C-alpha cells in the first residue's frame, strides 16, 4: 500500500477519508501521527488553503499528501462562515460553540432564507514541489435548521438539513453521507483522477 499523509489533525476527517481510501491501496496516515504541525492557513479560498496544507505535509514528511479544506457557506451571511468554519466562534472554537454561534447569528433569519452549502476541496500532491496538484471540489446544498438533530457526523452536521433525504447530515449513516456529501463528491473526483492519471 502507498503511504499518504493526510494534512489534517481533524479526527472526523481522518476517519471519513481513511475508510474511503483504503479500498484504493492508499494507507492514510494523519499528519499528527507523523509529528507534522499544522500549516498556517493564510489563503482566502478553500483551494489556496488546501494547497498550503498539502504542500506543508509533503515537505515535512517526504510523502505524497492529501489535504482537505472545507466549510459551510450560508447564503444569508454572504458565504460565511466559509474558510473560517472551524474557528467561527473564535480561537478556542469547538464544534458545539461554532454550531451555537451560527444558530444565534441566524435566529432572526426566516426559514425560507436559511439555504447553505457545504464545500470541500481535496488536493493531492505527489510530492512537495508538484507543479500540477490534483484539485477536486464538491458541494452539498442544504438548509440550516433551528435546532440540532442527530448524533452522527461532526461539525455543523446536526443543523444541516438535507432536503433530498428529509433529515440532517448528523442523522445520516456514514454510508448515506459519503454517497452524497461534499467530501464524498470531492473524493469520487479525486479517485477518478488518480485512476486515470
Curated annotation (Swiss-Prot):
Enzyme Commission code: 3.6.1.66
InterPro entries membership: dITP/XTP_pyrophosphatase (IPR020922), ITPase-like_fam (IPR029001), RdgB/HAM1 (IPR002637)
CDD domains on file: HAM1
Cofactor: Mg(2+)
SUPFAM superfamilies in the cross-refs: ITPase-like
GO BP field: nucleotide metabolic process; purine nucleoside triphosphate catabolic process
GO cellular component annotations of the record: cytosol
Free-text cofactor note: Binds 1 Mg(2+) ion per subunit.
One Pfam family it belongs to: Ham1p_like
Record note on quaternary structure: Homodimer.
Name under which the protein is recorded: dITP/XTP pyrophosphatase
Species in which this protein is naturally found: Shigella flexneri
Gene designation: rdgB
Amino acid at each position: 500500500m502507498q503511504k499518504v499523509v493526510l494534512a489534517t489533525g481533524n479526527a472526523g476527517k481522518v476517519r471519513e477519508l481513511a475508510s474511503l481510501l483504503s479500498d484504493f491501496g492508499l494507507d492514510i496516515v494523519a499528519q499528527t501521527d507523523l509529528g507534522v504541525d499544522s500549516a498556517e492557513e493564510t489563503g482566502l479560498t478553500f483551494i489556496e488553503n488546501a494547497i498550503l496544507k498539502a504542500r506543508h505535509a509533503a515537505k515535512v514528511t517526504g510523502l505524497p499528501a492529501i489535504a482537505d479544506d472545507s466549510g459551510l457557506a450560508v447564503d444569508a451571511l454572504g458565504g460565511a462562515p466559509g474558510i473560517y468554519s472551524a474557528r467561527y466562534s473564535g480561537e478556542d472554537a469547538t464544534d458545539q460553540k461554532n454550531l451555537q454561534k451560527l444558530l444565534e447569528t441566524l435566529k432572526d433569519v426566516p426559514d425560507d432564507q436559511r439555504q447553505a452549502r457545504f464545500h470541500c476541496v481535496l488536493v493531492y500532491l505527489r510530492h512537495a514541489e508538484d507543479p500540477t496538484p490534483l484539485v477536486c471540489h464538491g458541494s452539498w446544498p442544504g438548509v440550516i435548521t433551528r435546532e440540532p438533530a442527530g448524533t452522527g457526523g461532526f461539525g455543523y452536521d446536526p443543523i444541516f438539513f438535507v432536503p433530498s433525504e428529509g433529515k440532517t447530515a448528523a442523522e445520516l449513516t456514514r454510508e448515506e453521507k459519503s454517497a452524497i456529501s461534499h467530501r464524498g463528491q470531492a473524493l469520487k473526483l479525486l479517485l477518478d483522477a488518480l485512476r486515470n492519471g
